[in-house]
């Protein structure tokens, strides 16, 4: 499947025959800004990119932005863990896009996990 985390998605997920394997979530938390991390592929074939902007018309054609690959394997795994895995596992501040375009509170299972809280804890431990 495909997991997307963002606040302005121009996609309808879970549409039969089109996007049934796509899930879109939005995290409404302490921080307004979100990471611009793009991953393509799986496991050892995964390519990780960082960007200064989201991929919208206004950013791609009217501004100077940068998007670059993370070539260091260790760093790419860390970015994937902190940005993608962490945010897709958020089950307290996540909202999920429905096929009709509306959002509903995501009801995750297991121990409560807040992506932004976990990230702050991890980064302050290493400060």
Give the residues covered by each predicted segment.
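Single conserved hydrophobic/aromatic residue that forms the stacking wall/gate
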Residues: 1-6, 10-11
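Preference for short coil/turn "hinge" residues that link or interrupt alpha-helices
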Residues: 11, 17-20, 81, 90, ...
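Short, conserved secondary-structure transition motifs
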Residues: 12, 106-108
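Extended hydrophobic/aromatic segments used for targeting, binding, or gating
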Residues: 12-29, 52
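HKD (HxKxxxxD) catalytic microenvironment of the phospholipase D
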Residues: 26-102, 106
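C-terminal domain-tail junction helix/linker
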Residues: 108-127
């Amino acid at each position: 499947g495909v997991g997307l985390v963002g606040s302005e998605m121009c996609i309808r997920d879970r549409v039969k025959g089109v996007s049934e394997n796509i899930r879109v979530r939005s995290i409404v938390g302490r921080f307004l800004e979100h990471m611009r991390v793009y991953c393509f592929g799986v496991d050892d074939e995964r390519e990780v990119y960082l960007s200064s902007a989201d991929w919208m018309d206004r950013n791609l054609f009217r501004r100077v932005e940068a998007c670059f690959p993370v070539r260091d394997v260790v760093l790419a795994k860390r970015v994937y863990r902190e940005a993608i895995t962490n945010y897709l596992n958020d089950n307290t501040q996540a909202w999920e896009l429905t096929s009709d375009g509306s959002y509903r509170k995501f009801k995750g299972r297991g121990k409560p996990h807040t992506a932004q809280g976990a990230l702050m804890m991890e980064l302050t431990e290493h400060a």
